[in-house]
Amino acid sequence: FRLPRQADNTALHQETDPALKRLVVVASMLALLLGPNVSRAQSLPSIEDTVAVAEPLSGYFNLYWNNLTGQMFWEIDSLNTEFLYQVSMASGLGSNPVGIDRGQLSGTYVLSAKRVGPRLLLMQPNYRFRASSTNELERQAVQDSFAPSVLWGFDIVAETEGRVLVDASDFFLRDARDVTGTIANRGQGHFTLDVNRSAFYLDNTKAFPENVEIETLLTFTSSDPGTLVYGVAANGNSITLRQHHSLVKLPDDNFKIRLADPRIGTNGPTIQDYSTAIDEDLQIRLVARHRLEKKDPNAARSEPVEPIVYYVDSGTPEPIKSALIEGASWWNQAFDAAGFINAFQVKELPPGADAQDIRYNMIHWTHRRTRGYSYGGSVQDPRTGEIIKGNVNLGSLRLRQDYLHGQGLQPGFDYLSSAGGNNDASVNMALDRVRQLSAHEVGHTLGYPHNYLASSYGRESVMDYPAPLIEITEEEQLDFSNAYLQRIGEYDKLAVRYSYEQFPPGTDEGEELAKIVQESLDRGLLFMAHNNNNFVGAGHQYASVWDNGDNLVDQLKTEIEVRRIGLANFNPTLIREGEPYSELEYVLLPLYMHHRFQLNSAAQSLG
């Protein structure tokens, strides 16, 4: 194959039919005349025309629900502006080992919408690595060294005066929580999302001035579901869960970051700052904290501009609900020590409020088939450590385990009966534990990790793992009245002071924070978190779990004696009338193993 010579091309051109030449001229003229109309036909329609039959939800972002097509349109009016995106679970599977719970937080993302031609990309910057330098090129070098992410891409379907509209149905109706991966990792089958049995849950899809809340109903199917799934789902081959999405306006730039100190336990973002001096630590550890400011910055004690308010799940039964409110409210004692008056409040979630709404700090009462962990976490601004939402999940079956513990130790213990008569001490022990647990998990949402040393200096932190302190009377009876300390700890007050104390204008904050740290050392209010201290043979003598006492071996002797008295009193009256004797086994187990954690701790203290 060869190309014709130029002479041949010329000859061909010269021999072209005159009629064909006229046709080419006419076609060219038509193209010029129709060109603008063709361009207009290819331009995007207006947003108003596209959503003419849709129901608007106006807020921080505008959404449009088309009830005829089942589409959810998302209008973005500020391109390249960062916002917060949070995923959570509005309903749960009900299996503790699988770990998909009602009210559970999932991914937190800072995103911005970037337009590239006909596409809109949700960009996630990488805030874990940065440079605080004033040199723009230095900052850009760090930014280009660590990969950002594109969370999603959309086709733009309409636009009006710089505002763009996308069909966000697939984005919201996806498995954002990775339910399928979680179930598979637990060995409970291979599930897939069935889009034909999934839809928007419009009752909890709402728009507000600074946040938009979208909820979806997702159905997952499998031909090989595991026994844990079968044990809790209505149909193990098909499980339906509600997933929640929050699109939130990020806080303004007026929040002041505070640097962490390892001697006071705080959680928060850790950032690698490549502009630090060569003789300084590359890692910058921020304190996670709510935005809390005094009305009067010059006053030693002042009411806050806005208090921190936590809400208890309105589906919690009494007397547990009141116990949760009371225990969480202990933290107000710590904020009072930091100079704030009535800065921390706990209330019941008001009627009509959505627990998944990002504006509510929540304490959820979560049911599962079996007993499991309670936990507390928070939604944080990764740029500053500012806490945007605190979120607690308390497993309801924990209380029943505490009931079994007390039931074995004291004849006549009856958790399900009303408090009164001979059962007062036993019922109060269980509720005391609920108060302590509420304070403990709320502490995690406030940014505080476990402090396993506190049991060695008078139980002065609710952030320890507490064993019930059962005391023996002179009559060799068991006294439950001091089983769980019913107040905030002195260490907790220092931790809140470090995180939140507001110093008068002109004060050197670094010097004042150093004084708080030194006070904790001088008073012996020390901190030690996980750091491999959860097992026999761990490094620290006293940083152990579920123990009591400053001498762990001596306290072990006491726990063995408590166990002996409990076993001596063990009899069939420990179970309810009409129950089979086989139920005694469930009561006996926690009694028989009463000393087990103290034994572990004593062994650890000996090395």
Q: Where does each model-flagged region fall?
A:
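Bacterial N-terminal signal peptides that target proteins for export
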Residues: L3, L12-V25
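Conserved catalytic/binding loops enriched for acidic/polar residues
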Residues: S455-G607
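The catalytic-center signature of Zn2+-dependent metalloproteases
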Residues: L63, E348-H367, D432-R487
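Sec/Tat signal peptide C-region and signal peptidase I cleavage site
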Residues: N37-A41
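Bacterial N-terminal signal peptides
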Residues: V25-G35
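Auxiliary tRNA-acceptor-end handling modules of aminoacyl-tRNA synthetases
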Residues: Q42-T316, E348-Q401, G406-A425, V434
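Zn2+-dependent metallopeptidase catalytic core
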Residues: T81, P317-A343
